[in-house]
Amino acid sequence: MMPAYLDCNATTPVEKEVAREVSRFLVEEYGNPASPVHMYGTIARMGVEKARRDVAAVVAAQPEDVIFTSGATESNNLALLGLAEAGLRCGRTHFICSAIEHKAVLEPIESLQASGFEVTILPVDRTGVVRVEALAEALRPETLCVSIMHVNNETGVLQPLDEVAKALQDHHAWLHIDAAQGF
């Protein structure tokens, strides 16, 4: 009997072309991209900058706005905790997130709440979709950030990000999207 892998919401196989490219930089072009003073570092730097341009093109950003981290947890912490620091300076200390966020988002949010930030947890409907009406009702002038995942890592449910963004259109809150499962 052939095994069936049924956890593709959490982890999928790496595209062969991507694996080959990563392997090339791990085995052959293994220089330090922060040390472009020699050939290995220069080639590694060129690889990182190409990856930065490729990611920027996919997400309609400028390459200089793409920051690489070790993974989704570090990225979420950087975004949420960094925003919180800025929020303290401007008096905006309210975060909103959905009830079904990954722990990589929930843990920093809970930490912020324990340190005095206000947090609103949005409910989802019976299909696991965030209720945009509840988001609109939860917004306040001191709302700093709304964090909604793109695709749920357990159910595969896609969130209505266009509607979420539209609800924030006239508000000054940041929209943080954990897109690790949907990129």
Map each language-model feature to its residues.
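Pyridoxal 5′-phosphate
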Residues: 1-183
